[in-house]
């Protein structure tokens, strides 16, 4: 997985690949620097030279814009990356009486490290609201959920309430179940029984 490259070299290589795929010819050195916020053209030159030496790029020194991706090496590395990830369904609406991963519920997929699947079937749900902010789960976050229908006290779960999914901490008492928000301004939900859709095992957040 590009073990022999620095993060900057990977960034440059991927930019060149995208540029060629889109425009049909390679970018100029200055375009690479401008697009990747590299102020020094010599830094770009040095990294391109190293990519050539490591077999990822080929360049004709007598021609301008003569960078060429060596596809066999690039594709081999990309395939290795793909083997290490798996596309996980992103669930949109949740409907009562319908399996959580029914095709009608799935809006898209998102690649996650394959290790997540060793914990069972997983799906992603986008958080709406601020009921779990004190656990660091914010509005708009994507939570990674392991599909299961049971929970232990204190688990953060996705539960089905009034035909929609809610994210809360689960507590079973002698005569009721408490779904507790992690927001001191909100009250817990008290119910006799509830359908557990899964346990939250991770979180993904986009930083703009």
From Swiss-Prot:
Residues 29-49 bind DNA. The record marks 96-97 as: Cleavage. Keywords: Autocatalytic cleavage, DNA damage, DNA repair, DNA replication, DNA-binding, Hydrolase, Repressor, SOS response, Transcription, Transcription regulation. Its EC number is 3.4.21.88. Belongs to the peptidase S24 family. It comes from Finegoldia magna (strain ATCC 29328 / DSM 20472 / WAL 2508). It catalyses: Hydrolysis of Ala-|-Gly bond in repressor LexA. Represses a number of genes involved in the response to DNA damage (SOS response), including recA and lexA. In the presence of single-stranded DNA, RecA interacts with LexA causing an autocatalytic cleavage which disrupts the DNA-binding part of LexA, leading to derepression of the SOS regulon and eventually DNA repair. The active site is at residues 131, 168. HAMAP family: LexA. GO terms for biological process: DNA repair; DNA replication; negative regulation of DNA-templated transcription; proteolysis; SOS response. The keyword Signal does not apply. Homodimer. Gene3D superfamilies: Umud Fragment, subunit A (2.10.109.10), Winged helix-like DNA-binding domain superfamily/Winged helix DNA-binding domain (1.10.10.10). This is LexA repressor. GO terms for molecular function: DNA binding; serine-type endopeptidase activity.
């Amino acid at each position: 997985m590009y073990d022999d490259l620095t993060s900057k070299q990977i960034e440059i290589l991927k930019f060149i690949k995208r540029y060629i795929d889109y425009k049909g010819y390679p970018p100029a050195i200055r375009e690479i620097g401008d697009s990747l916020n590299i102020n020094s053209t010599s830094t770009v030159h040095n990294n391109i030279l190293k990519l050539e030496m490591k077999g990822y790029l080929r360049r004709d020194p007598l021609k301008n814009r003569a960078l060429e991706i060596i596809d066999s090496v690039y594709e081999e590395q990309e395939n290795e990356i793909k083997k290490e990830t798996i596309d996980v369904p992103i669930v949109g609406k949740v409907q009562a009486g319908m399996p959580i991963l029914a095709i009608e519920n799935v809006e898209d997929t998102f690649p996650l490290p394959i290790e997540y699947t060793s914990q069972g079937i997983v799906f992603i749900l986008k958080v709406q609201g601020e009921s779990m902010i004190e656990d660091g789960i914010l509005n708009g976050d994507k939570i990674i959920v392991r599909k299961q229908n049971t929970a232990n006290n204190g688990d953060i779960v996705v539960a089905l309430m009034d035909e929609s999914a809610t994210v809360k901490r689960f507590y079973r008492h002698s005569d009721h179940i408490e779904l507790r928000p992690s927001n001191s301004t909100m009250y817990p939900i008290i119910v006799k029984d509830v359908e557990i859709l899964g346990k939250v095992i991770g979180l993904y957040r986009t930083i703009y």
